[in-house]
Regions:
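A short Gly-Trp-Pro
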Residues: 2-149
């Protein structure tokens, strides 16, 4: 098995991950199931990320630990009326996670781009595809560069 990957009592895969913002002020760790990486194409995620979609993975219940810094919190009200706390770095603005509004959240939707092991995580499903930007569903054929041209 890969380093940092095991099984939890439920039989699901568990992978320990660490994460941080771009400037390093905020650090955290959690356990995730790498088979649960998701892409969301909803218009809220497009706006909140400033791009075509958001990629997240839920932390396993009770495993999220904030190791350093204090994130800024933005509370978003969904179309359903549910409230979600979105955390980001107050210095560099990196989106970090979202969780249910209120005390003692159980699980955190970790932003894959903030995870140190993000290259090991591949999305397994997509949601809100009806809101997807048409070009975002197929990037084949677009000119590619190893670095900024």
């Amino acid at each position: 098995m890969n380093a940092g990957i095991g099984r939890v009592s439920s039989g699901r895969m568990a992978m320990k991950v660490t994460g941080r913002c771009h400037c390093g002020q905020i650090t955290f760790e959690a356990e995730i199931d790498p088979a649960q990486v998701r892409v969301c194409h909803c218009t809220d995620c497009q706006t909140l990320t400033g791009t075509a979609f958001r990629t997240t993975v839920p932390s396993l219940p009770g495993s999220f630990v904030l190791r350093g810094g204090t994130p800024k919190i933005y509370i978003k009200t969904a179309e359903s009326g549910n409230k979600r706390m979105h955390a980001f770095c107050p210095e560099c603005g990196t989106p970090l996670y979202a969780t249910a509004a209120g005390a003692d959240p159980v699980s955190y939707g970790l932003r894959v781009g903030a995870l140190d092991r993000r290259a090991e995580l591949r999305p397994t499903r997509q949601g809100w595809c009806r809101s997807a930007l048409p070009w975002s569903m197929d990037l084949t054929g677009i000119e590619r560069f190893e670095r900024q041209p």
